[in-house]
């Protein structure tokens, strides 16, 4: 197996330069970033088709050529976090090598492949695999790639960036995959997410569905072929990464003003803590995790009310550690990072948060992860926001988060948890004018992923319409918050 690291060009004598200016490194130079995206490409690939898909905030390391599954992790040894994406036959290769790698894995996504690549029910039917191997030549390789791409236009686009490996080498690789699959034990590695193309003509979609029944936490489907440049780009250079980065940046900027402006969030934190006191057993909690702790408003309430033996605080923003420094000690620790990707300590008794879950991309997968982490009597408890939240902003700008209803959230939880308590309320804040509303949102950081660009005319129109539509009384305008509170016990 070959591993290569790709990143934008820097001054170095230890690099190879492509026509695009991307650097491809086999070994030698230190990583540029603390985290890496480890991509297991499919059979017959090299780095060429993927050199335009560099992650915005991670190094990209590509694995390919599975004539051997010897996995040299030298390039990965200094990273603090590894995000794995695997495609096609790379899913099988990754499933084999990752369990014994001891890498700091934070997330794993499988695209159009399975851990059982040669299987009538869970992969490529053996007769088709053998036929491809026995008849492989330049002409049949191009036919395979045409089926892989799904359409003539996608195939022509792929040919411009196709790998240049000789067909005899590809035949050796395919034969080695068949031999190794028959000799090696089946993997039990569990993936965070599997993505299935419903028009995949290489790995039949029904077989993929069957393969993932026990080996992934979430299945995502899309209407596309086995090789889909858009899907690969979204996962190798995801907009999600940049949106999470934007969220972190905006909350970081609001650290100094958040405690004063976040009146509703403070009210919600007090109520959430009161509900926990009412509905959780009276005995003290040993291990508690709070995700999205922010400046520590809810954290301090948890400490005073429950005195846990250990409280793990987590936030997307590393800078929040400084805001919580007064409560950090041997009993209270801080773990920065994306809660959706991190692994929290197993045996935790309570996983909780206030005003955070609405930012998550895959809350259902997070609920499943928490169920695995909690002890037998554990609870998940959180507040989030419902569909009426900031309805004024959504109506006037067309932008906002995809809020879920209380019923939708409890339905998602009910497969794994007993619902202990749910409630919701509507809170209306009054401001002197619409400009104060915008200032309030900016000072609390809750503009989040919104990329609204304001011109003078747009701003004037926004203010006029806001006053016309959302003025409860003379000389004031309103802003709606719609908190939802949920406490659930592991079943």
From Swiss-Prot:
Residues 250-490 are annotated as: Malonyl-CoA O-methyltransferase. One of its GO terms (biological process) is biotin biosynthetic process. The keyword S-adenosyl-L-methionine applies. Residues 1-249 are annotated as: Unknown. Keywords: Biotin biosynthesis, Methyltransferase, S-adenosyl-L-methionine, Transferase. Its EC number is 2.1.1.197. It holds the Pfam family BioG. It is an enzyme of class 2 (transferase). One of its GO terms (molecular function) is carboxyl-O-methyltransferase activity. It comes from the Bacteria. Belongs to the methyltransferase superfamily. Converts the free carboxyl group of a malonyl-thioester to its methyl ester by transfer of a methyl group from S-adenosyl-L-methionine (SAM). It allows to synthesize pimeloyl-ACP via the fatty acid synthetic pathway. This is Malonyl-[acyl-carrier protein] O-methyltransferase. The gene is bioC.
């Amino acid at each position: 197996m070959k591993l290569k690291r790709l990143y934008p060009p820097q001054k170095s004598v230890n690099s190879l330069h492509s026509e695009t200016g991307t650097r491809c490194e086999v070994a030698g130079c230190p990583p540029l970033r603390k985290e890496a995206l480890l991509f297991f490409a499919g059979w017959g690939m090299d780095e060429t088709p993927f050199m335009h898909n560099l992650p915005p905030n991670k190094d990209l390391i590509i694995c390919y050529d599975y004539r051997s599954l010897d996995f040299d992790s030298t390039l990965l040894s200094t990273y603090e976090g590894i995000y794995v994406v695997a495609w096609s036959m790379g899913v099988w290769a990754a499933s084999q090598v990752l369990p014994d790698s001891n890498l700091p894995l934070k997330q794993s996504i499988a695209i159009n492949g399975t851990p059982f690549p040669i299987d009538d029910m869970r992969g490529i039917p053996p007769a088709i695999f053998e036929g491809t191997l026995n008849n492989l030549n330049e002409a049949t390789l191009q036919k395979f790639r045409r089926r892989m791409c799904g359409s003539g236009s996608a195939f022509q686009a792929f040919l411009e960036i196709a790998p240049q490996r000789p067909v005899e080498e590809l035949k050796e690789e395919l034969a080695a995959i068949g031999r190794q699959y028959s000799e090696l034990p089946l993997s039990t590695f569990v993936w965070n997410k599997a993505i299935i193309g419903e028009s995949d003509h290489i790995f039949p979609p029904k077989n993929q569905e069957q393969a993932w029944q026990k080996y992934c936490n979430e299945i995502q489907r899309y209407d596309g072929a086995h090789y889909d440049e858009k899907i690969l780009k979204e996962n190798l250079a995801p907009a999600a990464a940049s949106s999470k980065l934007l969220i972190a940046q905006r909350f970081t900027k609001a650290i100094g003003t958040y405690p004063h402006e976040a009146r509703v969030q403070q009210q919600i934190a007090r109520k959430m803590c009161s509900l926990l006191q009412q509905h959780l057993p009276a005995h003290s909690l040993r291990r508690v995790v709070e995700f999205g702790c922010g400046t520590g408003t809810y954290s301090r309430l948890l400490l005073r009310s429950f005195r846990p033996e250990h409280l793990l605080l987590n936030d997307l923003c590393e800078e929040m550690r400084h805001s919580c420094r007064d409560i950090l000690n041997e009993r209270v620790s801080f773990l920065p990072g994306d809660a959706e990707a991190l692994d929290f300590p197993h045996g935790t008794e309570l996983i909780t948060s206030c005003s955070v879950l609405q930012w998550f991309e895959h809350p259902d997968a997070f609920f499943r992860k928490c169920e695995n982490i909690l002890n037998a009597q554990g609870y998940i408890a959180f507040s989030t926001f419902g569909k009426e939240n900031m309805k004024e902003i959504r109506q006037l700008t067309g932008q906002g988060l995809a809020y879920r209803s209380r019923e939708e959230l409890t339905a998602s939880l009910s497969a794994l948890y007993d619902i202990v308590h749910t409630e919701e309320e509507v809170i209306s804040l009054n401001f002197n004018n619409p400009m104060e509303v915008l200032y309030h949102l900016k000072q609390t950081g809750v503009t989040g992923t919104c990329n609204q660009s304001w011109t003078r005319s747009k701003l004037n129109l926004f203010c006029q319409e806001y006053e016309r539509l959302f003025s409860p009384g003379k000389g004031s305008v309103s802003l709606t918050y719609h908190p939802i509170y949920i406490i659930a016990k592991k079943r």
